[in-house]
From Swiss-Prot:
Its cofactor is Mg(2+). It holds the Pfam family XPG_N. Its EC number is 3.1.-.-. It is an enzyme of class 3 (hydrolase). Residues 122-253 are annotated as: I-domain. This is Flap endonuclease 1. It comes from Drosophila ananassae.
Amino acid sequence: MGILGLSKLIADLAPQAIRESEIKNFFGRKVAIDASMCLYQFLIAVRSEGAQLATVNGDPTSHLMGMFYRTIRLLDNGIKPVYVFDGKPPDLKSGELAKRAERREEAEKALKAATEAGDDAEIEKFNRRLVRVTKEHAREAKELLKLMGVPYVEAPCEAEAQCAALVKAGKVYATATEDMDALTFGSTKLLRYLTYSEARKMPVKEFSYEKLLDGLGVNNREFIDLCILLGCDYCESIKGIGPKRAIELINNYRDIETILDNLDTSKYTVPENWNYKIARELFIEPEVANADAIELKWTEPDEEGLVKFLCGDRQFNEDRVRSGAKKLLKSKQSQTQVRLDSFFKTLPSTPSATNAAKRKAEEAKKSANNKKAKTSGGGGGGRGRRPK
């Protein structure tokens, strides 16, 4: 679910925190990607990119197709992705998971009715709602990434929290996900729409954590309380409080405890046994693997391994898989060259340093020409050429 209404609130009150960019502008960046979010996008995608969407046994392959071709696209644009997979959800998320199960049951009933009515649009809509990422989807995706030479991380708990930890540790530049709670976990940069297909023509939206805090007039602790008021996965929110009222309350009272002390309970209903304090702690101290101990390595692809894994029962086109493997190898080699070039890059010159360098070059040139003039003439009284 993420954080309800946060994206619009930032756009309204802190627009300077959002920047739209083309994918090519992230050349050379390492990015931690929410793998489950990607797999979900790929599973509901209507169009394939030339591969079959199911095996001979009817098992879906759109998640593998999407992972393969979108990852190649990222690498083609000079981006170094690392995929982060969800672990066990925190106990506090059980309420949200129960609600999702209820919505799934409702979608199944609605799908049955739409099928009986022959309503294709409704059938497609409810089929999408029934899509979920399984452990088998994740296992296959990890195997594919390993063959592609792309690193992945298995989070002990929430993938967004682990992504944020990698960003804060300086291992990667940003978190790429559609869930805004990556910001609540403290990711200094959030990228939305990075893994969307080129056909959708969606610019990448980059959110700056520092700028949004400044624009909203809050610190990181107050921002977490704001997100809890807006509505998160870990606890209920106060009924009747929307985004505008939530930011007003945070700006006036600075934390949920003081808000509750001053809240008109005849107007707003506070959830019984509200676990906002535990939710707050989950955002402040999430269960994550030590980011400093995680080593990220991008290696050369295993072309034959990819062909064996994707072709055959999974029915991917072998020529396209081999072509993709060659693109992976090419991007790996070009990224190595970029790193070598950047190693020798000099610092930007200041105006005074630039002028001094010019003077030194001119003096050296003049000295060389003078020396040449003295030695270039014939014997005796020959004259040298005038320095240019």
